[in-house]
Amino acid sequence: MYHNHHFEFEYGKESGKLMIDRLISEIDPELMGFTVDTYWVQYGGANPANLIKRLKGRCPVVHFKDYAIDISDESSCVHMAACGSGNLDFKEIIEAFEYAGTEFVCVEQDNCYGEDPFACLERSYKYLKELGLE
């Protein structure tokens, strides 16, 4: 299982191809599946829902992590956020993982920026439940 971050959405110096494209096309699907991390896909400049759909049958797990832009903090304006607190379209992402045959979703937030992690998790849970995720 391969878990993405942002650097897979950069072009390789020698190949001139996106690293994620090479992983998808050059590794046998029987040998490796993908765990798509929504935050890191967006951070890399791609659309998480589009990637999940592209990986139909190869993406049994998705990590839900929202992507927030906070202009009040000039030192680091991009933050991980509780689901529904950022800019990602989770309705579209849910539709994509249903299409792709994804079996598991993990809610993840690496940094809560001083907030109680359980409060962040509760916000994510309530938001995703409102979207119909069971």
Question: Which sequence ranges carry the predicted segments?
Answer:
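Histidine-acidic metal/acid-base catalytic patches
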Residues: 17-36, 40-134
